[in-house]
């Protein structure tokens, strides 16, 4: 699953309301990795890495932020596996165009869980308002032609499940350990997956996005933790 908000943070947000302030979410905490949790967005790379590593610190088990190589291996393992409710077989073309199995702005997928709508603020190109997550329901996400979208709780859509992995395509962009550099040599970190405010024609699960500075936060960016058995 994508990393879900820590219990302590979820409990302090009245009715799961999201104001768009990264101060609510951009902090330390132990992520939840299970279905039905509000995904941890508005978090920068530094906190995402530290929080992913905080899940398990034992002699025989540890955790961390997913690497770019691990992401690529995960996608390769998915080829030939069944795509959730669609019952079709995932091919390499599904990695280039993830429309059929990811939660993106310009498609509709079936879900059983909670959903929050994100509305673009036309007066400020950097502002989106994320409305409250409702109660658990069944339905399909909306197909938008502009920068609006429906964000789902973790594991809400079986359509978005391949090889027992949820939301590798869409829902939230996910920080990785992979490094990139901008034209001035400043260190960035790569994001993968595409998100609920992304267009599937441009931002599929195999797409590498430069991400941004390690202190960048956004309504469409979260992370995923991986486990290491020693």
Outline where the language-model segments fall.
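Short aromatic-cysteine micro-motif
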Residues: 1-168
